[in-house]
UniProtKB/Swiss-Prot annotation:
<feature type="region of interest" description="Disordered">
    <location>
        <begin position="41"/>
        <end position="70"/>
    </location>
</feature>
<keyword id="KW-0934">Plastid</keyword>
<dbReference type="InterPro" id="IPR013785">
    <property type="entry name" value="Aldolase_TIM"/>
</dbReference>
<keyword id="KW-0057">Aromatic amino acid biosynthesis</keyword>
<comment type="similarity">
    <text>Belongs to the class-II DAHP synthase family.</text>
</comment>
<dbReference type="GO" id="GO:0009507">
    <property type="term" value="C:chloroplast"/>
</dbReference>
<comment type="pathway">
    <text>Metabolic intermediate biosynthesis; chorismate biosynthesis; chorismate from D-erythrose 4-phosphate and phosphoenolpyruvate: step 1/7.</text>
</comment>
<dbReference type="GO" id="GO:0009073">
    <property type="term" value="P:aromatic amino acid family biosynthetic process"/>
</dbReference>
<keyword id="KW-0150">Chloroplast</keyword>
<feature type="transit peptide" description="Chloroplast">
    <location>
        <begin position="1"/>
        <end position="39"/>
    </location>
</feature>
<dbReference type="GO" id="GO:0008652">
    <property type="term" value="P:amino acid biosynthetic process"/>
</dbReference>
<keyword id="KW-0808">Transferase</keyword>
<keyword id="KW-0028">Amino-acid biosynthesis</keyword>
<dbReference type="GO" id="GO:0009423">
    <property type="term" value="P:chorismate biosynthetic process"/>
</dbReference>
<keyword id="KW-0809">Transit peptide</keyword>
<dbReference type="Pfam" id="PF01474">
    <property type="entry name" value="DAHP_synth_2"/>
</dbReference>
<protein>
    <recommendedName>
        <fullName>Phospho-2-dehydro-3-deoxyheptonate aldolase 1, chloroplastic</fullName>
        <ecNumber>2.5.1.54</ecNumber>
    </recommendedName>
</protein>
Amino acid sequence: MSLATSSSMAGGAAVVPRSATATTASAFVTMKRRATAVRAVHAAEPSKNPPVGVPSAAKTSSPSVAAPEKAPVAAAPAPVAPAPAATKQVAPARWAVDSWRTKKALQLPEYPNAAELEAVLKTIEAFPPIVFAGEARHLEERLADAAMGRAFLLQGGDCAESFKEFNGNNIRDTFRVLLQMSAVLTFGGQMPVIKVGRMAGQFAKPRSEAFEERDGVKLPSYRGDNINGDAFNEKSRIPDPQRMVRAYAQSAATLNLLRAFATGGYAAMQRVTQWNLDFTQHSEQGDRYRELAHRVDEALGFMSAAGLTVDHPLMTSTDFWTSHECLLLPYEQSLTRQDSTTGHFYDCSAHMLWVGERTRQLDGAHVEFLRGVANPLGIKVSDKMNPTELVKLIEILNPSNKPGRITIITRMGAENMRVKLPHLIRAVRHAGQIVTWITDPMHGNTIKAPCGLKTRPFDSIAEVRAFFDVHDQEGSHPGGVHLEMTGQNVTECIGGSRTVTFDDLGDRYHTHCDPRLNASQSLELSFIIAERLRRKRIRSSKLNNMLPLPPFGV
């Protein structure tokens, strides 16, 4: 369910890594965790509760485990028929909310005080869910549209949220840029845009190195504000479980504000001309956006004259969902609840979760956890991904081949995209699997500037163009874009129409992790994408023997 309709829901009682190599999940926490079924309580939606292609938990007095795939579940008796696939159906192993602890886990911290960690996790287990199952199901339905080319996913936000930069203005500005980008993409593509934020929970970050060394001093790497601090001292870098409680509180507060923005009038379409940020006003992108906003205003005037007034709910609110990387598994487990209407488990820390490039091992702890939760899932895929491995991973996470369940987030670099992506698309198509393909043009294009700071050239982010070219070639649907961006006027990525240079990086380089697009660069990229969507729409119209509307005045 979207934020726009969340008011109809009733809430339930609302380390220092030893090495950079894998640790076992069982070594991560030595104490036994309870696997009791905790139900998320909300308004029943029988019509919106189709069974999901993931294991459901058996309702017993013993620790909850998933029933075999063929066993019927009382709350969801009608199984979804899988699409034809080349792979043989194999009954999945039994799943429980803590079965990931039997698998090898990468990128997890080791907390020095096991008793304190246990107490914190029990506290979070008792907290209300941050999101609701019905909201996640509604997002899955929308993502299914994107898989079929009927919608476009815009997913964006901070590389890593921080405690220090947590304030309402930053949340509002990022939300506002996403609204602007959505308006541009909707106008260009003439299709709905699904808005999903990397917000309200995007704290933990995987690291390529377990330790960081400065001036001969070696300390554990910073892994995100919900794990340890970024200050380079021993006390700050020790993983602190209390940070998970603060991350929960910040996530809940962020989502509360986002709900207010989405449904309280701020996102009303008639405010389209007011969304421009001050520092983008006198720029090429600001001028282009004002021109587009004027055309939208004219369209709204026509719609009003036709009877669709500006106070209609479609015009005064918007749908907005949240997402983050599923990395810190103890936290994710503590916020997993059993949905009272379907019996399925949902990770109620976010509407959508994704598994990262470093943690997507077929037999790993993160994949084991995610296969049992019914949220829509993303899979980060680099040029290292083997087509056969991708097909197997999709089969594990979506054995019933449910549309909208799986989003493939490609991050390869422009040239690798043209070489590698076609083979992945063909393999998935041959297996009969339904996925939503989107591009992450950020992670495959990170470089180090002469000053030592990480940056990303805006021109290299033209990986987006390669993404569209490949899908045009393969006859598949380019379903969306995934961006690390901010509404702040930062100087972290070089290039763009306002020409941020290497020398400018130090002016406003505020990221706690990786460089982000600023508002002007984000808007510029949305115009590039909108033009590709427009061209695709025109080609599709011609193929269907439909002529596009003539220019105004003809």
